[in-house]
């Protein structure tokens, strides 16, 4: 994603039906989150529409005018200190990791995979780190709404490459 951002650029985008941004296509919400209305069933696989390369009707900028580009993209080494240095210098990083069944049931605390089969992969944003009762962790923003985990965030054990999270870290310069 970072490389695409640097080479191809991305438009402003935004939440479903948000105004004042370029949305070449929309994905409606699904399921139920907190006190929001029920939006219909969520499906495991949603077909990605072909990008129209146009903004929605009524938006004042052309697609090409709305594009923003990153300056560079890079992969970080599988090294806690290198990841921490990059976050301190450039801000959050993106990490891919292997998802197991127990992750879907996370509510709070420091997540460490203990049970269940692999269900796929996922990308998240590592925004910081800390320690709780001597256990080091990454502080991570997830994309599964604020009714998941710790208000949309979670903590994952740091320093043992849990679910391979420390070997699949990417970042870029905006």
UniProtKB/Swiss-Prot annotation:
<keyword id="KW-0378">Hydrolase</keyword>
<protein>
    <recommendedName>
        <fullName>Cathepsin B-like cysteine proteinase 3</fullName>
        <ecNumber>3.4.22.-</ecNumber>
    </recommendedName>
</protein>
<keyword id="KW-1015">Disulfide bond</keyword>
<feature type="active site">
    <location>
        <position position="142"/>
    </location>
</feature>
<comment type="similarity">
    <text>Belongs to the peptidase C1 family.</text>
</comment>
<dbReference type="InterPro" id="IPR038765">
    <property type="entry name" value="Papain-like_cys_pep_sf"/>
</dbReference>
<dbReference type="InterPro" id="IPR025660">
    <property type="entry name" value="Pept_his_AS"/>
</dbReference>
<feature type="disulfide bond">
    <location>
        <begin position="22"/>
        <end position="55"/>
    </location>
</feature>
<dbReference type="GO" id="GO:0008234">
    <property type="term" value="F:cysteine-type peptidase activity"/>
</dbReference>
<keyword id="KW-0865">Zymogen</keyword>
<dbReference type="InterPro" id="IPR013128">
    <property type="entry name" value="Peptidase_C1A"/>
</dbReference>
<dbReference type="InterPro" id="IPR025661">
    <property type="entry name" value="Pept_asp_AS"/>
</dbReference>
<dbReference type="Pfam" id="PF00112">
    <property type="entry name" value="Peptidase_C1"/>
</dbReference>
<keyword id="KW-0645">Protease</keyword>
<dbReference type="GO" id="GO:0006508">
    <property type="term" value="P:proteolysis"/>
</dbReference>
<dbReference type="InterPro" id="IPR000668">
    <property type="entry name" value="Peptidase_C1A_C"/>
</dbReference>
<keyword id="KW-0788">Thiol protease</keyword>
<comment type="function">
    <text>Expression of the protease correlates with blood-feeding and suggests a role for the protease in blood digestion.</text>
</comment>
<feature type="active site">
    <location>
        <position position="122"/>
    </location>
</feature>
<feature type="disulfide bond">
    <location>
        <begin position="30"/>
        <end position="42"/>
    </location>
</feature>
């Amino acid at each position: 994603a970072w490389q695409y951002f640097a080479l191809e650029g991305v438009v402003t985008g935004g939440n479903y039906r948000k105004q004042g941004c370029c949305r070449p296509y929309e994905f409606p919400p699904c399921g139920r989150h907190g006190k929001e209305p029920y939006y219909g069933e969520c499906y495991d696989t949603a077909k990605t529409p072909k990008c129209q390369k146009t903004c929605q009707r009524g938006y004042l900028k052309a697609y090409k005018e709305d594009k923003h580009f990153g300056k560079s993209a890079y992969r970080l080494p599988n090294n806690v200190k290198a990841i921490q240095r990059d976050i301190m210098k450039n801000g959050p990083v993106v990490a891919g990791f292997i998802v197991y069944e127990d992750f879907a049931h996370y509510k709070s605390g420091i997540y460490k995979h203990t049970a269940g089969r692999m269900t796929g992969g996922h990308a998240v944003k590592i925004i910081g780190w800390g320690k709780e009762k001597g256990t080091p962790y990454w502080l991570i923003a997830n994309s599964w709404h604020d009714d998941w985990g710790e208000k949309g965030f979670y903590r994952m054990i740091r320093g043992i490459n849990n679910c391979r999270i420390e070997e699949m870290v990417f970042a870029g310069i905006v």
